[in-house]
Curated annotation (Swiss-Prot):
Family membership: Belongs to the TPP enzyme family. MenD subfamily.
Coiled-coil residues: none
Needed co-factor(s): Mg(2+); Mn(2+); thiamine diphosphate
Gene3D superfamilies from the UniProt entry: 3.40.50.970, TPP-binding domain
Organism: Aeromonas salmonicida (strain A449)
Job description of the protein: Catalyzes the thiamine diphosphate-dependent decarboxylation of 2-oxoglutarate and the subsequent addition of the resulting succinic semialdehyde-thiamine pyrophosphate anion to isochorismate to yield 2-succinyl-5-enolpyruvyl-6-hydroxy-3-cyclohexene-1-carboxylate (SEPHCHC).
Name of the protein: 2-succinyl-5-enolpyruvyl-6-hydroxy-3-cyclohexene-1-carboxylate synthase
């Protein structure tokens, strides 16, 4: 039953807003402290149906909520105070929009009369996130002249739009003072009475009908099956959906080229080392016999695969992805189907199992032998290769070198239960906070693989890990700066590369781990790494839920190793 007594009209509207969010399925709220957001915070604290997640840094807060939403697959609300606190959510909002993650931003704001007049902690928050929210609404200051149903109806409409186009939505809530309760609560039963049965039910005010996802059968599907095709698997969040893709490739007899984000990167049906094998002319020549491309999920990590797709003269190229966005950076698509893989497979049957048309697995074997040889010592390559064999539970992979190395080097095997990344905007900020949020979605352990600059960007969020209720292992690749730039054609004269790109910092993370109460290891051999990682997943070290394993390597080593490996594969 919805309460009739509240502190102020601000609190009535805040309670209505959060109650309707709960009735529409929201269960997690991320909160940072602040005064202007007091009505929202108090309503969230009083509601027994929410799991509340706290962080003192709004930038990390946004990314934590992003991880919670990615892990749970459900919308997550985020509450923050006014001013630059709101602006700090910008990176997480951009990432959420680009990857279709449902965040609900509830920003507190000054009332209109305190905007643009020199009032403290007041900025123009209307439309602050630009075009990145899929829907945004500026709620007026609460007043008895606006019916309570307006608040409920607004929530219903915005979340219906979010269901149609997954991504962030933004409610800007303009609260005048008073923001806190007085000596006694007031009775608002007269104001709430027009809501009728809603006050005593658990149903939303005006739920919108959602259409079931159906993928119409393409009339030329039968003809496409008869061609030499390949299946590329990009970002697929649901492992069950990914298995549909692997089974479809198997029935068609088409090679499967699966990205790290596909949930089937470690599947034996995948050409597991295709990225590095694309440097070999025999492998490329065999792959180039393909006539058509069927891709599930976008945002590929492998630049070499992206270049092959861009340059190959496809007879046809279809992309299946549930996000209703243009995902065609090279303008090569000929068919765009907005649905999940299972919906596509339900209407696009493969009547008979086809024999493979290719010998790509055979062509890949020599590259695989070179990879295993290059990964047999303690290095970034060696650690990432060994991690692929050791990993238990979930994997969150940071951007820059970690994502590329895991995409290149992983072996076929059990692999992680789920893989998650932030590959929308592909920033190196907020990765620790996102991984923490992602870890909260599962009782399984979560491993975060991250670089040193990414860790420095989000050092505040180590505070989240110190209070984690889930086992989490951080593997931190410390090559003293931005070593990925050594892979790019940056001029090396006059120390330009070192001074302006790699930015060596000379820092290590043992004291950071101690400050935030994390267990710390710094192995120097692959055997020590394996022992440290397996121990971090077991008791008694789980009494400290999080272990930080720092991998200290020379700055130029990873670039030199990859260049040598590439040369060896090209020479096969």
């Amino acid at each position: 039953m919805f309460a009739s007594q509240h502190a102020t009209f601000n609190h009535v509207w805040s309670s209505l807003l959060l109650e309707e969010l709960h009735r529409l399925g929201v269960r997690d709220i991320a909160l940072a402290s602040g005064s202007r957001s007091a009505p929202l915070t108090m309503a969230a604290a009083a509601h027994a149906g929410f799991r509340r997640h706290l962080h003192f840094d709004e930038r990390g807060l946004g990314f934590m909520a992003l991880g919670l939403a990615k892990g749970s697959g459900r919308p997550v609300a985020v509450i923050m105070t006014s001013g630059t606190a709101v602006a700090n959510l910008w990176p997480a909002v951009a990432e959420a929009q680009l990857t279709g993650v449902p965040l609900i931003i509830l920003s507190a704001d000054r009332p209109p009369e305190l905007i643009d007049n020199g009032a403290n902690q007041a900025i123009d928050q209307q439309g602050i996130f630009g075009r990145y929210p899929v829907y945004q609404q500026n709620l007026p200051s609460p007043t008895p002249t606006i019916p309570a149903a307006f608040v409920l109806s607004s929530v219903d409409q915005v979340l219906a739009q979010q269901a149609l186009t997954p991504g962030p939505v933004h409610f800007n809530c303009m609260y005048p003072e008073p923001l806190y309760p007085g000596d006694e609560y007031l009775d608002f039963s007269g104001y709430l009475a027009p809501l009728g049965d809603w006050l005593h039910s658990s149903e939303p005010w005006s739920p919108w009908q959602q259409n079931e996802q159906i993928c119409p059968r393409q009339p030329d599907w039968a003809a496409l099956q008869g061609k030499r095709g390949i299946i590329v698997a990009g970002r697929i969040q649901d492992p069950a959906q990914a298995q549909v893709v692997a089974e479809l490739a198997e029935r068609l007899g088409w090679p499967l080229l699966a990205d790290l984000q596909s949930q089937i990167r470690f599947d034996a049906r995948n050409l597991i080392h295709m990225d590095l094998a694309l440097q070999n002319s025999c492998f490329v020549a065999e792959l180039a016999r393909a006539e058509v491309l069927l891709q599930f999920g976008a945002r590929l990590i492998s630049k070499r695969l992206g270049q092959f797709i861009k340059q190959h003269p496809w007879q046809d190229y279809w992309l299946v992805d549930p996000q209703p966005a243009r995902l065609d950076p090279d303008y090569r698509l000929r068919r765009r189907l907005v649905c999940e893989p299972a919906a596509f497979a339900a209407t696009h049957k493969v009547s008979t199992r086809h024999l493979p048309w290719h010998r790509l697995a055979e062509r890949q074997q020599s590259a695989t032998r070179q990879i295993r040889s290059a990964c047999d010592r303690f290095s970034e390559l060696g650690v990432c290769h060994r991690l692929g064999n050791l990993i238990q539970g979930q994997l969150f992979v940071g951007n820059s070198m970690p994502a590329r190395l895991m995409d290149m080097l992983g072996e076929a095997g059990k692999g992680p239960s789920r893989v998650m990344t932030n590959r929308g905007a592909s920033g190196i900020d907020g990765l620790i906070a996102t991984a923490y949020g992602f870890a909260q979605s599962s009782e399984q352990p979560t491993t975060l693989l991250i670089g040193d600059l990414s860790a420095l960007h989000d050092l505040n969020s180590l505070a989240l890990l110190g209070k984690s209720s889930r086992p989490l292992v951080v593997i931190l690749l410390n090559n003293d700066g931005g070593s990925i730039f050594r892979m790019l054609p940056v001029p090396t004269g006059d120390r330009l590369l070192e001074t302006y790109y790699c930015l060596p910092h000379g820092l290590h993370f043992e004291h950071a781990a101690a400050m935030f109460g994390l267990h710390y290891r710094a192995p120097t051999t692959l055997a020590e790494f394996e022992q440290a990682y397996t121990a971090a997943l077991k008791k008694p070290e789980l009494e400290k839920k999080v272990t930080l394993i720092e991998i200290k390597v020379p700055s130029s080593e990873v670039a030199e190793d990859l260049k040598a490996l590439g040369a060896a594969i090209r020479g096969l």
